[in-house]
A protein has these predicted regions:
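Non-catalytic signal-transmission and effector/linker regions of two-component phosphorelay proteins
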Residues: 1-11, 17-18, 24, 82-83, ...
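Conserved sequence signature across two-component system core domains
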Residues: 13-14, 39, 57
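Two-component/phosphorelay signaling modules centered on CheY-like receiver
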Residues: 17-37, 108
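Helix N-cap/capping motif at the beta->alpha junctions
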Residues: 24, 38-47, 68-71
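Receiver (REC) domain active-site loop signature in two-component systems and cognate sites
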Residues: 63-66
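Short, conserved "switch-loop" micro-motifs in signal-transduction and mechanochemical regulators
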Residues: 94-96
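A Lys-centered signature of the CheY-like receiver
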Residues: 115-116
Length: 131
């Protein structure tokens, strides 16, 4: 049976520092007891996930170094190789979701899509429902 992720850990991944700060403030205050980590790109997200096994990732799609799709695929590979449960991934973008996001959500109902700008209440409700 696959080993579960750390249910009390959340990873926010976005290359826009202001969004990361805002999301961290909102979610830290709304989800007491949750460890909220951050990453600025997909490469940092993969490294943070390998170290901390976050149960939920809130991830932008368009980032430098490694984009959301590449990070998602790498995390999926890591989970398969290590027999870990795949974390819930909440994709977050200001653009129309690409087909691969729709396919990922169809394959795993724990994954979700949020369109930027997103209200605080929707953000909190969506993340809380995945933790």
């Amino acid at each position: 049976m696959p080993e579960p992720c750390a249910r009390d850990k959340l990873l926010i991944v976005d290359d826009e520092a202001a969004i990361v700060r805002l999301f961290k403030i909102i979610l830290s205050s709304s989800l007491p007891g949750t460890v909220v980590d951050t990453a600025q790109n997909g490469k940092e997200a993969v490294e943070a996930f390998e170290r901390n096994r976050h149960a939920t990732l809130l991830m932008d799609l368009h980032m430098p170094v490694m984009d959301g799709r590449q990070a998602f695929q790498k995390i999926k590979e890591i989970c398969k190789e290590n027999d870990w449960v795949m974390p819930s991934v909440i994709f977050c973008t200001g653009y129309a979701p690409p087909e691969w996001v729709n396919a990922a959500m169809a394959a795993n109902p724990a994954h979700r899509m949020l369109n930027k700008p997103v209200s605080s209440s929707t953000l909190i409700e969506t993340v809380r429902g995945r933790m």
